[in-house]
Amino acid sequence: MTITPQEALQRTIEHREIFHDEMLHLMRLIMRGDLSPVMAAAIITGLRVKKETIGEIAAAATVMREFANHVEVQDNSNFVDIVGTGGDGSHTFNISTASMFVTAAAGAKVAKHGNRGVSSKSGSADVLEALGVNIDLQSDQVAASIAETGMGFMFAPNHHPAMKNIAAVRRELGVRTIFNILGPLTNPAGAPNQLMGVFHADLVGIQVRVMQRLGAQHVLVVYGKDGMDEVSLGAATLVGELRDGKVHEYEIHPEDFGLQMVSNRTLKVENADESRTMLLGALDNQPGVAREIVTLNAGTALYAANVAESIADGIQLAREAIASGKARAKVDELVRFTQQFKR
């Protein structure tokens, strides 16, 4: 069933839901650039004001996946994405990127989907470039990277070219819209497992149920109650877990895993170079908060990837990957592998 853009806008004004097929139609218009900037801006703002439903987000993510340049991965076992929505305003170093190296070193395959920093001082793309990684790979090269190194970085603009049709509107609006939460839902490699950090407590239950509708296997959506879009050391973390088709919501604390609750203040960085230094320090097994929060998040990712039986088991595997030097070696391995494709 189709709906006109004007009807959709009226629906948002009346705080009524746009149904699945209607949302598919609208989103395709946006992704093809067939809506005027005024209409596109009005609809995505209207959705934000009325609050997007699980069904609307799932439909939008379905279309964004349709328009993506996909990465074909042959073996889906222990395959995980570690990603945050960003926008948490914490300005910490790239914890999920550091966790990628540890998670891969401990036996998972990681497809990291990311971009340059917008709200943060250093996005995943920025810190990977600072480390010497070539982020500008084609889809087949990313697939080769995952097969060879256990890691692949998908630079969002290379995989979502249709997003250029809404980029100017989003930039001019300058407020969060549905597109801020679609990125983590649209991994171009289709990783069935995921550790996803979100910027608001309400999104925990929403995003995990969107992933349920999209057919994901094992997903942990997390929100640190100190405002972090990661598993936090500074507060309890809300978790929405999808496993075997069922959703469970619960809370975890650093002390549950023998970790001390400490402030995340020392994790703040001003730029990608500072983030690089902190990331390498953690992977070099330097004692401190950076190493502990990477261990905690990598351990959670290893549980999501089904490499570990529990978060606690995952943390133990993460500790071993760091202490053995395997996690640090993964950085050099990814740099070497991706540099051969330098154009």
UniProtKB/Swiss-Prot annotation:
Residues binding 5-phospho-alpha-D-ribose 1-diphosphate, per UniProt: 84, 87-88, 92, 94-97, 112-120, 124
InterPro entries for this protein: Anthranilate_Pribosyl_Tfrase, Glycosyl_Trfase_fam3, Glycosyl_Trfase_fam3_N_dom, Glycosyl_Trfase_fam3_N_dom_sf, Nuc_phospho_transferase
UniProt-recorded Gene Ontology molecular function terms: anthranilate phosphoribosyltransferase activity; magnesium ion binding
Residues reported in the UniProt entry to bind anthranilate 2: 170
Top EC class of this enzyme: transferase
Binding site for Mg(2+) 1: 96, 230
Gene Ontology CC terms, in alphabetical order: cytosol
Any one of the GO BP annotations: L-tryptophan biosynthetic process
Residues bound to Mg(2+) 2: 229-230
Binding site for anthranilate 1: 84, 115
Catalytic activity line of the entry: N-(5-phospho-beta-D-ribosyl)anthranilate + diphosphate = 5-phospho-alpha-D-ribose 1-diphosphate + anthranilate
Family: Belongs to the anthranilate phosphoribosyltransferase family.
Record PANTHER family: ANTHRANILATE PHOSPHORIBOSYLTRANSFERASE
Known function: Catalyzes the transfer of the phosphoribosyl group of 5-phosphorylribose-1-pyrophosphate (PRPP) to anthranilate to yield N-(5'-phosphoribosyl)-anthranilate (PRA).
Name of protein: Anthranilate phosphoribosyltransferase
Gene: trpD
